[in-house]
């Protein structure tokens, strides 16, 4: 069985890890970095760039450089959060035919899972380069507060990237695994505060140790899937734009190129202000008007940044209270607080969390790598490489159905340990009713329409009977990935209907298969291109070396042979300009055949040179001992 890799598919950065013996190892990508920016760019000449190369060209290609796609995955276009992003993102977010949030890239409609798959492909390639073997299986992490549609869409992204997603696990749980495995302690209750690039989660996790086996049980989870570092960046960008407008009278929001430069500068300034009290945002030639070029030079203090984002940090505190309440615990019951996600490096975030829990958060967990390490550990658990670890996760939101009067009736309440199964018997609302519609919902609101609709199906063929008489058993079954399967059965007739909640904001099987085929086709064309380049290089080398040999052979090469070689060289040169690998190889073969005589001459010349240099060395040895000693010394240095 091959390795199951662990992938942290982040909003801003992604990371991949594997189990190396008993230790999890974070892998470096082709650029030598342990994390990869979750940025995908589609260039004008049809190339797809992922990670640092995509980030580098963002300034000159803002409309086709896609970032923070995780904020859109599994979401509807009309969602309030998506509409907020529509107005601030430089790329184009559109509504798909099925109501999902998709993207328009160079006139082509693309689904978020399709784009996220490009990042996953890079993670897969990073692992394959390290292991030297194909990788087909992965554990991928998602925010604990992701709903069913978002989880399913993440699984779809894995499939499109050519990965069988063996398990979807929650990011805070993964971080707890990374933290808890190397701590030889007894029972502990920990709080994982995870503020990443686009999402926020809090999980309360109990680590129990019984006879050497560690059980990681999630007691409660809460969060906000649209709160993260990107929002902090946006606040700073808006401040800089407003200051520049006050100073110069120019609104940079109408200039995508300037906004892209500003985004990079704001992110850099935010990071610098975690260690410095003040920084300069200095962007020469940011724009120009009739009077000439304009430059931005604005001082930003840490206090200013904190005043801009204070409400965002406070927004993360409310879910902490709810999670503790759901777990039935108080602040004093928490032994350790772990910070995950790059945004937790901000001193103000650390201070607020410390104030809430009454203790300093731990600093020995790398906030960028902990989640990927935990995912790799879970991969090790699934392959049997990691023993004595049991992970008990929970469903983040209540699941139920719509019942008479538009009420949401929960079958599985939030923070129930998964996998789980629950059944309840319902009946008809009308006399002689022959069919019922099962409307599956996710959320905490009483009114059905205020919750997230996950899908609906009909159960037909109910025998005529007075209302309230038929017995319809509805069963909710959640698997270990947190994905829901629902069935309804008429106990009288035995008729049954089932549905797996395929992300209602997601892709159908046909669309996924097409994207998988496209990805495979791209991989094939990439491989062919690589082979073509290698053959071209070989042809180029042959061309150069043959010309040199013709020159050196001079008059020793018969005229007929020379003409044939010149003709073959010209044919190879033409073939090298084309895209046909077979044609290049054929012309190389032809050149080799007509160059037989040339090769003989080259070998003779080489043999003569060798003999000549041997004679010269012998003469030198006779003539002058001192020179010989110097010669020997130089040879030793070599």
Curated annotation (Swiss-Prot):
Induction: By stress conditions e.g. heat shock. One of its GO terms (molecular function) is unfolded protein binding. GO terms for biological process: DNA replication. Residues 603-638 are annotated as: Disordered. Keywords: ATP-binding, Chaperone, DNA replication, Nucleotide-binding, Phosphoprotein, Stress response. Autophosphorylated; GrpE inhibits the autophosphorylation. Residues 603-620 have a biased composition (Low complexity). The modification Phosphothreonine is found at residue 199. CDD domains: ASKHA_NBD_HSP70_DnaK-like. It comes from the Bacteria. The keyword ATP-binding applies. Belongs to the heat shock protein 70 family. Acts as a chaperone. HAMAP family: DnaK. This is Chaperone protein DnaK. It comes from Salmonella typhi. The lineage of its organism: Bacteria, Pseudomonadati, Pseudomonadota, Gammaproteobacteria, Enterobacterales.
């Amino acid at each position: 069985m091959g390795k199951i890799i662990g992938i942290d598919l982040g909003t801003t950065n992604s990371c991949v890890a594997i189990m190396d013996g008993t230790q999890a190892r974070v892998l470096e990508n082709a650029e030598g970095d342990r994390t990869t920016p979750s940025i995908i760019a589609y260039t004008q000449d049809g190339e797809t760039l992922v990670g640092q190369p995509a980030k580098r060209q963002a300034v000159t290609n803002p409309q086709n450089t896609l970032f923070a796609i995780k904020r859109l995955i599994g979401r509807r276009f009309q969602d309030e959060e998506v509409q907020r992003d529509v107005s601030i993102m430089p790329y184009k977010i559109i509504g798909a035919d099925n109501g999902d949030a998709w993207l328009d890239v160079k006139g082509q409609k693309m689904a978020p899972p399709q784009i996220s798959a490009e990042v996953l492909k890079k993670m897969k390639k990073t692992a394959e380069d390290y292991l030297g073997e194909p990788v087909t299986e992965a554990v991928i992490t998602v925010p604990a507060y992701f709903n069913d549609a978002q989880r399913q869409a993440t699984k779809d992204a894995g499939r499109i990237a050519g990965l069988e997603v063996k398990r979807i696990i929650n990011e805070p749980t993964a971080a707890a695994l990374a933290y808890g495995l190397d701590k030889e302690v007894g029972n502990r209750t920990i709080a994982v505060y995870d503020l990443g690039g686009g999402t926020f989660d809090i999980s309360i996790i109990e680590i129990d140790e019984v006879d050497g086996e560690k059980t990681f049980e999630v007691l409660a989870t809460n969060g906000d899937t649209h709160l993260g570092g990107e929002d902090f960046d946006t606040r700073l960008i808006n401040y800089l734009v407003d200051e520049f407008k006050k100073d110069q009278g120019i609104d940079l929001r109408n200039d995508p190129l300037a906004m892209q430069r500003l985004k990079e500068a704001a992110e850099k300034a935010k990071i610098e202000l975690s260690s410095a009290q003040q920084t300069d945002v200095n962007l020469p030639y940011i724009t120009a008007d009739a009077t000439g070029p304009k430059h931005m030079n604005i001082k930003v203090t840490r206090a200013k940044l904190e005043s801009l984002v204070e409400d965002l940090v406070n927004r993360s505190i409310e879910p902490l209270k709810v999670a503790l309440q759901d777990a039935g615990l108080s602040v004093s019951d928490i032994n350790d607080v772990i910070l995950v996600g790059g945004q937790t490096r901000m001193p103000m975030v650390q201070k607020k969390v410390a104030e809430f829990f009454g203790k300093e958060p731990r600093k020995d967990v790398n906030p960028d790598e902990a989640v990927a390490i935990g995912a790799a550990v879970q991969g090790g658990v699934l392959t049997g490489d990691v023993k004595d670890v049991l992970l008990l996760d929970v469903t983040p939101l209540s699941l139920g159905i719509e019942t008479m009067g538009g009420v949401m009736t929960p079958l599985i309440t939030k923070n129930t340990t998964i996998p789980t199964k629950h059944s309840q018997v319902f009946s008809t609302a009308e006399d002689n009713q022959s069919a019922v519609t099962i409307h599956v919902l996710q959320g905490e609101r009483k009114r059905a329409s205020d919750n997230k609709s996950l899908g609906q199906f009909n159960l037909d063929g109910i025998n005529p009977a007075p209302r309230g008489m038929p017995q319809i058993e509805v069963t909710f079954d959640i698997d270990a990935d947190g994905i829901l399967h629902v069935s309804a059965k008429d106990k009288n007739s035995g008729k049954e209907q089932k549905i797996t909640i395929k992300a209602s904001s997601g892709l159908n099987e046909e669309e996924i298969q097409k994207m998988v085929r496209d990805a495979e086709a791209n991989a094939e064309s990439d491989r062919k291109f690589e082979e073509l380049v290698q053959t071209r290089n070989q042809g180029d080398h042959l061309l150069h070396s043959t010309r040199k040999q013709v020159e050196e052979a001079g008059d020793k090469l018969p005229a007929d042979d020379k003409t044939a070689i010149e003709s073959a060289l010209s044919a190879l040169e033409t073939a090298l300009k084309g895209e046909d690998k077979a044609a290049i190889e054929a012309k190389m073969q032809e050149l080799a055949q007509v160059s037989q005589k040339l090769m003989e001459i080259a070998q003779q010349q080489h043999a003569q040179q060798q003999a000549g240099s041997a004679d010269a060395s012998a003469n030198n040895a006779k003539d002058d001992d001192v020179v010989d000693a110097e010669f020997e010394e130089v040879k030793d240095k070599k």
